Curated annotation (Swiss-Prot):
Region of interest (Interaction with tRNA), ranges: 154-156, 316-317
Species whose genome carries this gene: Pseudomonas savastanoi pv. phaseolicola (strain 1448A / Race 6)
Start and end residues of each stretch annotated as Interaction with target base in tRNA: 103-105
Domain of life, source organism: Bacteria
Subcellular location, record wording: Cytoplasm
Biological process terms in GO annotation: tRNA wobble position uridine thiolation
Enzyme active site: 108, 204
Summary of the function given for this chain in its UniProt record: Catalyzes the 2-thiolation of uridine at the wobble position (U34) of tRNA, leading to the formation of s(2)U34.
Disulfide bonds: 108-204
NCBIfam families hit by this protein: PRK00143.1, trmU
SUPFAM superfamilies assigned: Adenine nucleotide alpha hydrolases-like (SSF52402)
Entry keywords, A to Z: ATP-binding, Cytoplasm, Disulfide bond, Nucleotide-binding, RNA-binding, Transferase, tRNA processing, tRNA-binding
Name the record gives this protein: tRNA-specific 2-thiouridylase MnmA
Catalysed reactions, as listed in the record: S-sulfanyl-L-cysteinyl-[protein] + uridine(34) in tRNA + AH2 + ATP = 2-thiouridine(34) in tRNA + L-cysteinyl-[protein] + A + AMP + diphosphate + H(+)
Amino acid sequence: MRDPAPSNSEMKRVIVGMSGGVDSSVSAVLLMEQGYQVEGLFMKNWEEDDGTEYCTAREDLADAQAVCDKIGIKLHTANFAAEYWDNVFEHFLEEYKAGRTPNPDILCNREIKFKAFLDYALMLGADLIATGHYVRRRDIDGRTELLKGLDPNKDQSYFLHAVGGEQIARTLFPVGELEKPEVRAIAEKHGLATAKKKDSTGICFIGERRFTDFLRQYLPAQPGEIKTTEGEVIGRHSGLMYHTIGQRQGLGIGGLKDASDDPWYVLVKDLDNNELIVGQGNDHPWLFSRALVSSEIYWVNPIDLSSPRKLTAKVRYRQGDQPCTLEKTADGYRATFDDPQRAVTPGQSVVFYDGEICLGGGVIEIAEPWTSKDKR
């Protein structure tokens, strides 16, 4: 179902979040073709005062302006750097201090793109906002549902699970019905400057720089020992914050006597002892979990969990739907999976689905081992 076009008698004003990328550029074009009164808004969420050349905000703003000039719409600019620091980045640092691996893009969507931006757009007189996210929405029975994007390779519902239905109801997602090649073709057809611009990667405020170099600017390193599951010390790490469950690269382990040639993986981050526990093999049993616990779930719309419910879930972006049973417990929520789940990582998010409907999700706090013999 495509996002609704306005009736001829009611020209709705829509402000598109223009990132300087091809998806938001095409979103603006599509909305204009549907008859909306379209304007753009470029958000600056990070101050470029860290002495590096990595931040691309100036280039992105120039690209957004070029697109708006080409299609003949006004471009507003807004600085949400203070809100980003207070509501996203400080939480990001606290999570790393606690040894978890957070996903700031999820919090950015909830606090900045669908809160600060939405509020600002409404203040400017907009009826709706729009973004270039690959998701869809559906209005049914007095509520607005968040649906997966039709392109399974680009679906971004995982990152929008913490946005409430009321915010989704005020947002249009023009490219959610399209596949990426179609989006680029539309951009080429209209001669947009962003038509061949590559997709952004990594966390927005880090850009293309090395993550460990960035994190060291804000958090002191806390070196410790790297141990096997048997307790043998085989190396040293520069800080648990620089590692995540299932990580293979960058461990600096090699040439050990009596060890096989199988690669080493991070199995456990022992926060109490500041130790990194590693093991060999992509299918090491310690890498697999049967259940996870989250104390709080953000629902797009409230759901009934008076009894356990069969759903599907993702514990990382682009993962296939994993069948599970979700139940409410005294301390929060517990999801038990039908099949073993690899590298379930505290700090990351679990997102629940009912078919194509994204129901919501929360931060993973505990990953329960798959086998009872696993004494993590």
